[in-house]
């Protein structure tokens, strides 16, 4: 097919006008049309969230194919494999549709070929392209095409450790061993070993892997900061900072004296304020840096007098307290800044003094890193196994050094397209440059969504082009896609309100102006005031809520707040759970979130990437089993195996065995003691009774068989033998969350199999690999099991990128930013290279023996401080972008959830805004998202912000206030029995029919340790024949029951189940105020308070309730309310007589009267029945349990038991 020319600028403008004047319901924007059809130059599309960038890419590709370009002539890079597959699917549909629409035979044939070639097109991640490239051209570097990827983190760590120790030994024994020893000690820390150095080496290596040429960067940039260090310039900068700080302090104190000080006349602190003003006043234009430093020292010294209270306003007058507090707060802020500057003077002096020593240390580090990088590179070549970054490095090496290969790709690719360009790193950017001919790049992204700095992505790659193309269109075309087709106007307005005031070039790396603001474009979503974004704060005032570390088993106020809103959405507005997303910046609080959702029965689906696989109990048991098989002399692992469910040794048995020491041995490990016990070769052999001896023999025989089996079989076979021999796989399947536990065990076998297929063999090496992963505080990804279909989504903000949800809750707004990077011993920068903390040994000059002669001082190098400042700004910018991504996931409504003391938050004061932005110090001193949001709320109170904040206290978060999840079963109707007891009897009967005698005998043992309810105990232990008369769906008609031939009811009228009526009746009986005279009117008012639907309330017969209180029992209750206990929970330890296993019974007693020597127990039943004896038989066992619990609790034997039957038109009270 002959190439069709691309559109000129004039033709594009006409197309834009025609689109604007068309009658289409969903029109392309002018910018979208420009992005689709512009050609002949490099193009950067800055596409805000929800602006249709994927649509634009697909349309652009389709247009190029329709003009005769081959799909093989396009290089299209996506950020994920999923995105690549989605783009291919979209292109397949568009190409197919185009083929059907066109009458041009040549075009049909051409597009048909493109459709056939689509699976082989260069559409995918950069990693997938480089793998294919190296497979084809790797021979140029002597790399075999059958190389494999080191995707397994544990295998990679194993190789790294081996290489590290080889290089370490070479340097430790080499010619420069003294300087290397100094390097080693510098990072030794408390461990005083090589682990500190190893940690920093791996950190630097990961950084190097993101550069286009690691060895070149090490050579050219690693020491750059030391080479260009300018201490004179740093001192001048510091002097300017001191000047500004002293002027700020002077302004603050003068304002205080002129305005507020008269309220505190003759206060002692005012004299010191004047002293400081005199000190600062002594400075003039001629003052040098020494003079400023001297004044700073005097000022700080004055502030520290009187135990630091020399400048404190200690007024106790109630009416002046706010004024005094405001002064003291600002004074603390000012002097904190002065204290930091005073410290910086000292640090700068030490930095200059030890600069030469630190530089020497850095050179030693550079040498070690160079050797490590090369040795690790060679080792991976020997294994023919590479990391993804290695593949990219070799691809770049081939493209740079073999012009014929580079030129063939540059000629082949008509266009080099890249999605998510803001998350590109330098190695990827270099590759894109080499594949392009210099003017055929199409880059799509949004710098506001660059959130992968931890993967070495550099948003400045995007930003540099954005600025350059904006200033000089000849360099390239900049196109802005600002219209948002995803979210409601309420979501977009709130997002704009936040980032207009938060993000600029200084803090945020871009100025959030009209080029970046979101524009509402989804006309299908009409404005709705109910969808105004909400900033919800759990008020911690006077709640006494414990710190997070103490609340692992407690539902946090924050989560109860969220659950209340979720239930409101679900039950009042009919929102499906799957329409709700909970976003977190990290998974550190996920356990609390999952616990809270589980407590309220809310289904949840996680992102499936919790890296806690090795922490799961069933995997830990198996790992200890493998450790014992490898080496039974490991006491901890051996005890863990013996105590595990596979063998079940208890503490008493282990204690008896641990005393079996041979007489002639001083110390023996546990395994040797087990051998002694078997041989009866100990003076304490009398402790080994027959049952224990048999149990020990079985254990030792099985362990010996496993150890023998391990010598001749694969790890995979060994693991499955263990599962099968001890039924462990089946056992964990019966535990709570059984399918997930079995999936973990299955994955362990698969991971062992993969390990042995990767040229690593044997149990010892597998255990060593696992231990190294744990030692490095890493873990393996947890196994994902099938999630529920309708469930709330819980995921990190990173995982949510590219997704959208109608309702979004951003949780943990109060969670502090992670600043671990800035606390490291090493901080790297592309511009400055290595920043390091140098450990200097200093003479103290002490003469006395009890004083140390030398001390160690940690001195951050000048480059370290510069890199630290750079890192802080980059980190805050990334956190802002993370919040932007989170807020723009919402389609309809956005909730921002945090917590804090209302009193403290509302008393906070902030500096005035500048140019419509929060003060830069306010932004840089924020510890979390909440600090930013709250500051905006306070500073811009006069602005009509498009989000509101609301404090929610404990009184609004009680169980009653939150409510319960309403659950309904289609099998239940009003004719069925009280479902608290009988809703699973059918399943129980079917299960019992198939149960074997052994399982029946040991039923409690199988279930235990567990907690049972009375109805569960009844189901498990009462004879099946005693349940005669209970109607069970699908089990046939009960005797005397008439068969109905009525047509089924397909009406939409709300169905009311027996379970709902039963629950509502119990709640009503609990709520009735027995201190007042009971009337129909008072019962009606009480019924309104019951948490249920009106349809259920209408089914409750209040006359029948009133009639109960006319019975003998009812009158006794009314006359003895001071002896009455209602809805009382209990728990009781029971023993199963057949298996002799203990278990716990828990339940709730409807009510009882407690007298001195007698208890009257009663229980309400709403079951339908023919004869009272039916219910008496049915619930006899349950009441017997209640009776036993009360008898044990109060030591009273005389207990009367009554059933109050409400299932007929007339109430009946039956004594049991």
Curated annotation (Swiss-Prot):
Residues 26-488 form the UvrD-like helicase ATP-binding domain. It catalyses: Couples ATP hydrolysis with the unwinding of duplex DNA by translocating in the 3'-5' direction; ATP + H2O = ADP + phosphate + H(+). Its EC number is 3.1.-.-, 5.6.2.4. Its cofactor is Mg(2+). GO terms for cellular component: cytosol; DNA helicase complex. Residues 515-802 form the UvrD-like helicase C-terminal domain. Keywords: ATP-binding, DNA damage, DNA repair, DNA-binding, Exonuclease, Helicase, Hydrolase, Isomerase, Nuclease, Nucleotide-binding. ATP binds at residues 47-54. One of its GO terms (biological process) is double-strand break repair via homologous recombination. GO terms for molecular function: 3'-5' DNA helicase activity; 3'-5' exonuclease activity; ATP binding; ATP hydrolysis activity; double-stranded DNA binding. The keyword Isomerase applies. Heterodimer of AddA and AddB/RexB. The heterodimer acts as both an ATP-dependent DNA helicase and an ATP-dependent, dual-direction single-stranded exonuclease. Recognizes the chi site generating a DNA molecule suitable for the initiation of homologous recombination. The AddA nuclease domain is required for chi fragment generation; this subunit has the helicase and 3' -> 5' nuclease activities. Belongs to the helicase family. AddA subfamily. This is ATP-dependent helicase/nuclease subunit A. It comes from Streptococcus pneumoniae (strain Hungary19A-6). The gene is addA.
């Amino acid at each position: 097919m002959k190439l069709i020319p691309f559109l000129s600028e004039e033709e594009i403008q006409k197309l834009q006008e025609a689109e604007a004047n068309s009658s289409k319901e969903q029109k392309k924007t002018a910018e979208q049309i420009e992005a689709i059809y512009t050609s002949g130059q490099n193009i950067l599309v800055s596409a805000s969230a929800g602006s249709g960038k994927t649509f634009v890419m697909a349309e652009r590709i389709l247009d190029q194919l329709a003009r005769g370009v081959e799909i093989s002539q396009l290089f299209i890079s996506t950020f994920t494999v999923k995105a690549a597959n989605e783009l291919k699917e979209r292109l397949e549909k568009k190409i197919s549709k185009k083929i059907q629409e066109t009458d041009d035979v040549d075009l049909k044939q051409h597009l048909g070929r493109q459709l056939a070639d689509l699976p082989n097109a260069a559409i995918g991640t950069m990693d997938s392209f480089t793998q294919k490239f190296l497979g084809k051209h790797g021979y140029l570097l002597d790399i075999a095409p059958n190389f494999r990827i080191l995707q397994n983190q544990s295998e990679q760590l194993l190789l790294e450790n081996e290489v590290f120790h080889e290089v370490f030994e070479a340097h430790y024994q080499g010619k420069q061993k003294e300087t290397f020893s100094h390097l080693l000690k510098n990072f030794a820390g408390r461990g005083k070993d090589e682990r500190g150095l190893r940690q920093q080496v791996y950190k630097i290596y990961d950084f190097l892997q993101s550069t286009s040429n690691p060895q070149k960067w090490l050579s050219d940039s690693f020491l750059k900061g030391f080479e260009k260090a300018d201490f004179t310039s740093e001192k001048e900068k510091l002097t300017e900072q001191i000047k500004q700080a002293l002027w700020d302090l002077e302004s603050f104190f003068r304002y205080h004296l002129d305005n507020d000080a008269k309220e505190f006349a003759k206060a002692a602190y005012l004299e010191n304020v004047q002293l400081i003003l005199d000190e600062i006043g002594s400075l003039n234009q001629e003052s040098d840096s020494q003079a400023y430093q001297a004044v700073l020292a005097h000022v700080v010294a004055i502030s520290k007098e009187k135990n630091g209270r020399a400048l404190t306003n200690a007024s106790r007058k109630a009416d002046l307290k706010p004024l005094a507090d405001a002064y003291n707060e600002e004074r603390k802020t000012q002097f904190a800044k002065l204290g930091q500057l005073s410290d910086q003077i000292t640090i700068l002096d030490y930095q200059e003094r030890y600069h030469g020593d630190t530089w020497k240390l850095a050179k030693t580090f550079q040498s070690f890193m160079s050797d490590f990088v090369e040795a690790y590179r060679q080792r991976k070549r020997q294994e023919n196994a590479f990391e993804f970054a290695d593949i990219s490095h070799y691809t770049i090496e081939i493209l740079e050094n073999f012009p014929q290969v580079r030129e063939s790709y540059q000629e082949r690719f008509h266009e080099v397209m890249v999605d998510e360009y803001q998350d590109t790193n330098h190695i990827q950017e270099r590759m894109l440059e080499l594949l392009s001919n210099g003017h055929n790049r199409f880059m799509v992204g949004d710098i506001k969504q660059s959130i992968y700095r931890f993967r070495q992505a550099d948003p400045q790659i995007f930003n540099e082009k954005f600025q350059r193309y904006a200033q000089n269109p000849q360099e390239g075309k900049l196109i802005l896609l600002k219209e948002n087709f995803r979210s409601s106007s309420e979501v977009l307005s709130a997002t704009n309100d936040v980032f207009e005031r938060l993000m600029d070039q200084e803090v945020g790396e871009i100025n959030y102006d009209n080029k970046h603001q979101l524009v509402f474009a989804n006309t299908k979503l009409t404005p709705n005031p109910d969808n105004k974004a909400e900033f919800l704060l759990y008020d911690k005032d006077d709640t006494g809520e414990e710190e997070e570390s103490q609340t692992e088993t407690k539902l946090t106020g924050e989560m109860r707040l969220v659950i209340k809103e979720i239930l409101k959405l679900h039950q009042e507005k009919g929102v499906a759970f799957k329409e709700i997303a909970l976003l977190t910046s990290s998974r550190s609080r996920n356990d609390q979130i999952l616990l809270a959702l589980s407590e309220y029965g809310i289904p949840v689906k996680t992102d499936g990437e919790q890296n806690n696989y090795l922490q799961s109990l069933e995997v830990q048991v198996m790992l200890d089993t493998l450790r014992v098989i490898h080496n039974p002399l490991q006491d901890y692992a051996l005890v863990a195996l013996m105590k595990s469910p596979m063998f079940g040794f208890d503490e008493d048995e282990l204690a008896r065995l641990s005393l079996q020491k041979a007489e002639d041995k001083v110390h023996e490990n546990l395994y040797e003691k087990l051998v002694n016990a078997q041989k009866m070769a100990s003076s304490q052999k009398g402790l080994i009774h027959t049952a224990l001896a048999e149990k020990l023999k079985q254990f030792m025989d099985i362990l010996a068989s496993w150890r023998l089996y391990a010598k001749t079989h694969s790890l995979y076979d060994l693991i499955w033998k263990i599962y099968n021999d001890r039924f462990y796989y089946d056992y964990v399947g019966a535990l709570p969350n059984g399918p997930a536990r079995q999936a973990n065990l299955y994955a362990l076998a698969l991971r062992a199999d993969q390990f042995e297929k990767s040229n690593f063999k044997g149990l010892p090496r597998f255990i060593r690999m696992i231990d190294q992963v744990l030692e490095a505080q890493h873990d393996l990804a947890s196994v994902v099991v099938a999630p529920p279909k309708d469930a709330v989504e819980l995921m990190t903000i990173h995982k949510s990128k590219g997704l959208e949800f109608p309702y979004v809750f951003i949780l943990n707004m109060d969670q502090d930013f992670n600043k671990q990077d800035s606390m490291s011993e090493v901080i790297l920068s592309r511009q400055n290279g290595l920043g390091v903390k140098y450990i200097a040994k200093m003479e103290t000059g002490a003469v006395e023996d009890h004083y140390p002669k030398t001390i160690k001082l940690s001195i951050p190098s000048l480059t370290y401080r510069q890199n630290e400042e750079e890192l802080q700004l980059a980190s805050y910018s990334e956190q802002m972008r993370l919040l932007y991504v989170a807020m723009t996931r919402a389609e309809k409504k956005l909730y921002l959830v945090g917590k804090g003391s209302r009193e403290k938050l509302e008393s906070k004061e902030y500096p005035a805004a500048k140019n419509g932005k929060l003060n830069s110090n306010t932004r840089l001193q924020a510890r979390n998202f909440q600090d930013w949001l709250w500051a905006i709320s306070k500073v811009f109170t006069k602005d009509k912000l498009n989000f509101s904040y609301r404090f929610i206290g404990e009184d609004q978060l009680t169980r009653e206030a939150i409510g319960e999840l309403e659950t309904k079963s289609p099998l239940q109707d009003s004719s069925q029995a009280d479902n608290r007891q009988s809703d699973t009897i059918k399943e129980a009967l079917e299960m019992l029919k198939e149960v074997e005698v052994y399982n029946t005998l040991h039923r409690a043992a199988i279930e235990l340790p567990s907690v049972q309810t009375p109805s569960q105990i009844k189901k498990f232990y009462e004879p099946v024949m005693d349940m005669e008369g209970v109607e069970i769906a699908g089990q046939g008609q009960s005797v005397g029951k008439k068969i109905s031939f009525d047509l089924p009811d397909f009406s939409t009228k709300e169905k009311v189940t027996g379970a709902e009526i039963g629950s509502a009746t119990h709640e009503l009986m609990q709520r009735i105020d027995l201190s007042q005279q009971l009337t129909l009117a008072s019962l009606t008012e009480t019924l309104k308070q019951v948490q249920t639907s009106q349809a259920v309330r209408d089914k409750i017969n209040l006359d029948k309730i009133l009639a109960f209180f006319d019975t003998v029992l009812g009158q006794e209750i009314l006359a003895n309310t001071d002896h009455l206990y209602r809805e009382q929970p209990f728990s009781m330890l029971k023993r199963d007589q057949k298996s002799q296993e203990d278990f716990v019974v828990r339940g709730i007693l409807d009510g009882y009267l407690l007298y001195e020597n007698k208890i009257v127990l009663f229980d309400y039943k709403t079951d339908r029945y023919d004869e009272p004896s039916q219910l008496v038989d049915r619930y006899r066992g349950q009441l017997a349990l209640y009776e036993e619990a009360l008898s044990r609790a109060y030591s009273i034997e005389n207990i009367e038991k009554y059933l109050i039957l409400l299932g007929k038109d007339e109430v009946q009270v039956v004594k049991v």
